Design a protein with these regions (language model features):
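Surface-exposed amphipathic alpha-helical tracts and adjacent flexible/coil segments at the periphery
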Residues: 1-18, 23-34, 48-49, 55-83, ...
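Conserved phosphate-binding/catalytic loop of the ribokinase/pfkB sugar-kinase fold
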Residues: 116-120
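Glycine/small-residue-rich interface belts in oligomeric ring/scaffold proteins
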Residues: 40-45, 50
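A short acidic, glycine-rich active-site loop
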Residues: 37
Length: 694
């Protein structure tokens, strides 16, 4: 099982390698989810790959952000550079970047980032079909789900075992971008989840979105038995000393050792938020998983000890064999071989006739084992010596240094990379004329007579609501297509009831599904449904749109992190939909904020609202069909008065999305859309369509 450690800087990389990492993951100056880390320039990247490969450590490059069309040429340059440097894998979020990696550097493995929100075997299967050789699972998964996925997965599985936990499923958090233009999907998360929030205007503030750090140091044997290929430590923003301490602890356990209470205390002192949690892994969510960063104990001595592990000397981690031949009248010969079969040779001086003492195999071995200060450990010496010869120790040492230097150069030399030229995808201008109307609701009770009379092209209804209202297909016009909204998270163990509901609505005549992640896409197609893509797929570029076209999607809702000019310019390889009204979904949460407040589930009794430091209220509702929470924006997105400006952008449809609205409020919005009245949206937002994100 691979130990994968973070490297936010060259110093952190050395800390990881010297403390037992099998692989490191790092980011370049651009296109990685930790843009506030020190990261690596082109020269740094080359140095890092050489340093790691010499020591038998793999390097995974993070390309795990969303990439805009105008940025694709720069992303292509980085991919080609990294491949030529010899990186061992790309960690990718964006579907368009996956396509780009496969085109430009087809021999470099692609790992599906946790930012892809993959949380089921179905999502893993879709990622494998996409060309990924490894999937990093969502942190929220319990042990039984991980075991099920590992048992049937066609690709390697990677699991986070230590470090920060986000309250939201990775890749589905828009809180930082919507309230401050700093997008987590672009590597700029401002971590507003770590701030205090109240449960109402008159309640004391708490930290209901701030989770403790994950720690699965005691679960590694279980993960190994499951078949997990790689365990991952979070922390590219952390100090090198932290990386050293945590990597060393997990290496100790992987090597069969046990962590003492003092070791666990060191982990907590290095960094924690009021302790650690294994709640997600154990399936035990709740209020005891939450904590916040506080000033802890003095770390000076602990960090000084950690620095010594990578600043003083170098661990000898690569076993090598030496082969020596000392013949009378011939130059001395020495060779060294590493475990990968790299063989390097050199010649030395002609040995002299011994006068006092002959060179023995023991003398030779003693000199050849002096590999201190290098990453190599001499494990064996084989020699063939003629008798009564003398060779100075200085000559043997010089030969040893020569072959070691040549071996180091060979191990650090990148294999020739197969690189292809960059090309732009074909452009599709989209649909001319007036965009269609689509409507999404949270409950069947929100479907009003006025809504049905407007004959929206598509009416999106949660799958569970559709299954419970078999009369809906008869109520809608033949000009309106019903589409089932799948639960945003469907663990493999939750698939059976979803499959039953899909069969039910199929028999009702529903033939379309709205999918927001790869797992949903797989489930829908397997069940025989046409697929429309939702915002959770995070589509921000033309290459991703082309991928969706290849997958046969009927339409795609573009990311609400795009600006209107970017929406205009993106290739409409599939019919493009735009959200113009509704509360933006900011977080999708496995932990129930409602239940954590009082210990009682409040899903059916009302809406909980979190209040931030400036008094902004954020409603929390449950994702239909599940008990998962969705944090909504306090302000409604409102672009109904901008419909004319949206013509000529190639859009297929404009979507109205209703969440907390009652039927009366919904009808007022619909009348506004029709131009029959002006809806007082109150405190509304134009979203990110004009502001954009960093």
């Amino acid at each position: 099982m691979e130990l994968l450690a973070p490297a936010g800087s060259m110093e952190a990389l050395r800390a990881a390698v010297c403390n037992g990492a099998d692989a490191v993951y790092l980011g370049a100056d651009t296109f990685n989810a930790r843009m506030n880390a020190r990261n690596f320039s082109a020269a740094d990247l080359q140095e890092a790959v050489v340093y790691c490969h010499v020591r038998g450590v793999k390097v995974h490059l993070t390309l795990n952000t969303l990439v805009l069309d105008r940025e694709m040429p720069r992303a292509a340059e980085l991919i080609r550079l990294a491949a030529s440097c010899g990186v061992d894998a790309f960690i990718v979020q964006d579907l368009g970047v996956v396509s780009l990696c496969r085109q430009l550097a087809p021999d470099v493995p692609i790992h599906a980032s946790t930012q892809m929100s993959i949380h089921s075997l179905e999502g893993v299967m879709e990622a494998a079909a996409l060309g990924c050789s490894r999937v990093v699972l969502a942190r929220e998964l319990p042990a039984e789900e991980i075991a099920h996925i590992c048992k049937k997965s066609p690709v390697e599985i990677e699991v986070f075992v230590h470090g920060a936990l986000c309250m939201c499923y990775s890749g589905q958090c828009y809180l930082s971008s919507v309230i401050g233009r700093r997008s987590g999907n672009r590597g700029q998360c401002a971590q507003p989840c770590r701030l205090p929030y109240g449960y109402g205007r008159f309640e004391s503030t708490r930290y209901p979105l701030s989770l403790k750090d994950n720690c699965l140091a005691g679960e590694l044997d279980e993960l190994r038995r499951m078949g997990v290929a790689s365990i991952k430590i979070e922390g590219r923003m952390k100090r090198p000393e932290y990386v050293a301490i945590v990597t060393r602890a997990y290496r100790t356990v992987l090597n069969g050792g046990k962590l003492m209470p003092s070791d666990l205390q060191e982990l907590e002192t290095a960094f924690s938020r009021q302790g650690f949690t294994d709640g997600y892994f154990r399936g035990q969510t709740g209020s005891d998983m939450f904590g916040r960063r506080q000033e802890g104990e003095d770390t000076a001595d602990l960090f000084a000890s950690a620095r010594a592990t990578y600043e003083q000397g170098e661990p000898q981690r690569i076993g090598v064999r030496f082969y020596a031949m000392i013949r009378r009248g011939e130059p001395a010969q020495l060779a060294v071989e590493d475990p990968d079969g790299n063989l390097c040779r050199t010649r030395g001086p002609v040995p002299e006739q011994a006068v006092y003492r002959s060179l023995t195999p023991q003398d030779l071995e003693q000199q050849l084992k002096k590999t201190g200060g290098t990453p190599y450990l001499c494990t064996a010496v084989r020699s063939s010596l003629d008798p009564d010869l003398m060779l100075p120790a200085s000559a043997i040492n010089a030969m040893r240094r020569d072959v070691i230097a040549e071996l180091t150069a060979k191990r650090g030399r990148a294999a020739p990379a197969r690189l292809n030229a960059y090309d732009e995808p074909p452009r599709y201008d989209g649909i001319a004329g007036e965009p269609q109307l689509t409507i999404a609701v949270r409950t069947a009770g929100q479907i009003t007579s006025r809504m049905l009379s407007m004959k929206p092209t598509v009416l999106y209804v949660p799958l569970s609501e559709l299954a419970e209202h078999p009369d809906l297909p008869q109520r809608v016009s033949v000009e309106t297509q019903l589409a089932a909204i799948l639960p945003r998270v469907i663990w493999s163990g939750e698939l059976a009831p979803v499959a039953r509901q899909l069969r039910t609505v199929y028999e009702m005549g529903v033939r379309q599904v709205l999918a927001g992640n790869l797992g949903q896409l797989h489930i829908a197609r397997t069940a025989g449904f046409a697929v429309r893509g939702d915002f959770g797929l995070n589509i921000v570029n033309s290459r991703a749109m082309r991928y969706l076209r290849e997958q046969g999607l009927d339409s795609q809702l573009l990311s609400f992190e795009l600006t209107l000019p970017q929406i205009r310019d993106i290739s409409k390889a599939v019919p493009a939909e735009l959200l113009i009204y509704g509360r933006l979904p900011l977080m999708l949460m496995e932990n129930c904020v409602m239940k954590n407040r009082t210990g009682i589930c409040a899903c059916q009794t009302g809406t909980v609202r979190l209040v931030d430091r400036v008094g902004e209220e954020f409603p929390i509702v449950k994702d239909p069909g599940t008990c998962r929470n969705v944090l909504l924006n306090g302000k409604k997105l409102y672009l109904l008065d901008k419909k004319d400006a949206l013509r000529g952008m190639g859009l297929w449809a404009l979507r109205l999305q209703f969440t907390t609205e009652n039927p009366g409020e919904i009808d007022k919005v619909l009348m506004d859309y029709q131009g029959r009245a002006v809806f007082d949206a109150g405190s509304y937002t134009r979203g990110l369509y004009s502001r954009g994100v960093e």
